[in-house]
């Protein structure tokens, strides 16, 4: 089987002819030098052009990043080397390097050197620490030197390719070549070193349309790759994947297996001739330069070949080398969430195939390595070969001794104890297989689950899965697709019953085999089950777990991570990245066990687990209980006062809510509790809550609704003391204390309103208020103040005022007492009364009458106003409390003092 290389185009940048490309080691940038004299920097993540350097008017055939100096170094047909700062776009240095076109630049990985090659047949070494002086010249080629590359395993050695049909290997410090490789029939355009430690290989491409692999120790050609129809312009060993990439003037890019030399894939993006290729260690990105622009493609799987067993032993593949690390060896070292673990790595040996995936079997005794269309099962301890074979795919069963392979797109074989047990052909073919409690087979028609023992169809589901994860008990399964994931419950008892009776069995299997528990619109990258909790990493780099319909975020990851496993005794979850770094995050097994018990409605088990959960984690558990509908248990478990208060309100637990409100001393909480108390008809508690909340509007509503005159009176005093003047005014007014309303308006500077109130309800006070109004207004507008008319001075402007004095006295004497509410039906409404008629024959006292006739208003009735002393402010709540549950409606003031104004007219 060919390598399973996913090839995705990440960037297409249209431009003039591209002569060289380079990738930045840390930024998502691609550097492209163009035939028109420009150099561009593209961001391949955002698909945008981020920087442009106008170098010259001639072709720029070479450009390289020098990341440690923030430089871009260019070489052009004007023979000049230019150095730019890619942050400021400033040109740092420029000098003439050769006497002909500059073909290639190579940057030394550790020293302050660059190597340049040219059509003048020379290679030169430049030292930027010595003001860009030429440290050495390498002579020997007899034609253009097309490319130079430094040996990644020996930085003092480099190789060069020339149109003189030779490849020369040089040593820094020696002006003559170490040796020359000959074999191409035409000029050699490109060269590259193999970066792995197992092969001393070089690759070259030439105008004879051939690609040759050389052993530079034995100085022999070990392989020739044929296939291109035109000159081979670029050739490269990928630094991470076991592939060779070649590009040609025939417009194609060919990908070859670096071990078998088999052609794996041919790419043609329709951008004419391919001139250059660049790749980067630690990345699967490959940059290509063509006549019509540049392209970045992503090759292969990002997911590393890595696996961990239940005891914390991790095995991974670094190229073809298999290594092991043991979490137990860390002992009691302090581990912080998200930090790289300092693991001791042990080499286990080399694998005969290039591992694309590594996976332990369920009990951890064996590990399977898959790649190159083959699988090898090793013992996990010593990496001894136990079994092997050809397969496109491999899957372990839940039974550790059983596994399946996909031999082709139509045949699946099942093995037991390393011996073939059964072979079958799924009805609709087999594009992929999945292990677990049932054997999953994906086809063009969807997903089919089969019984491991007899390969009977259990259920066919119209879904195209990407991953399938089974829980340890086999009751739950997660099916992850490209856009979402589904949680299903496997009903094994119904399956057994259907297999015995054959009831409910259709051509799509057993109808009741699965029950859908939920669908979540999130992309799962990797996942595993702990109990009934599904833990997964998402496409947006979040580490979450799903339980009972709730998604809990454990951590936000700063890069793509892959789940390895969970160690219950450590209470930690372990993940790895593509650089084989291992990190961990805390996840308490007690929390997961509790949530699992709740999901199974096993509350006795949940109660046993609860004491083992730390207090700081209990609120998280309480939120889970609340979402499951168990609010009473959530109230008991939660330690967050805010959460407990909300739950107490929802459950109507007045006592608990009251205690929490007392502790919180929050006005908002008192208001919320007051609403609940009113809904529960607990008016005494509601009054206390409203008082704590200083909600005078609410207290007024409560007092008036209950007809509690004493409460209204006390409320008026308290509201005035605290500056709640509107409530104070309304409270006085409802009690018929119009004189107190008047004094309140005067004290608060509302003199116009006071004047109109006096004219309507207290005619005897009009003159006094007008004088105060005039005095106050004169400070602002003297003319306006003089226009105000005082009744004592302009009696003709206030007809009927004397009669109003009499009516006022009559009202004071006849309406002084409160009437019981039971007399309300006997009281005539204001709109049906004529107070002037009712007051006929009334004789006011001599003193009051004489004052009125003399034009002097009677002294105002004293108004009792709450003092501002500390004693008044600290009144006990007991003074405001009233037993509203046993309320008698005897003391409601039904005296209507809102006299219509028309009764004061003549």
Swiss-Prot record:
Record PTM Phosphoserine, positions in chain: 859
Alphabetical keyword list: Acetylation, Coiled coil, Cytoplasm, Cytoplasmic vesicle, ER-Golgi transport, Golgi apparatus, Membrane, Phosphoprotein, Protein transport, Repeat, Transport, WD repeat
Region (Disordered): 837-862
Organism lineage string: Eukaryota, Metazoa, Chordata, Craniata, Vertebrata
The name this protein goes by in its record: Coatomer subunit beta'
InterPro entries noted in UniProt: Beta-prop_COPA/B_2nd, Coatomer_complex_subunit, COPB2, G-protein_beta_WD-40_rep, TPR_COPA_B, WD40/YVTN_repeat-like_dom_sf, WD40_repeat_dom_sf, WD40_rpt
Residue numbers carrying N6-acetyllysine: 627
Pfam families per record: B-prop_COPA_B_2nd, TPR_COPA_B, WD40
Membrane topology reported for the UniProt record: Peripheral membrane protein
Function: The coatomer is a cytosolic protein complex that binds to dilysine motifs and reversibly associates with Golgi non-clathrin-coated vesicles, which further mediate biosynthetic protein transport from the ER, via the Golgi up to the trans Golgi network. Coatomer complex is required for budding from Golgi membranes, and is essential for the retrograde Golgi-to-ER transport of dilysine-tagged proteins.
Keyword Phosphoprotein: yes
Modified residues annotated as Phosphothreonine in this record: 861
Coiled-coil zones: 866-890
Gene Ontology molecular function: any one: structural molecule activity
Subunit structure: Oligomeric complex that consists of at least the alpha, beta, beta', gamma, delta, epsilon and zeta subunits. Probably interacts with PEX11A. Interacts with SCYL1. Interacts with JAGN1.
Originating species: Macaca fascicularis (Crab-eating macaque)
Predominant location: cytoplasm
Family to which this protein belongs: Belongs to the WD repeat COPB2 family.
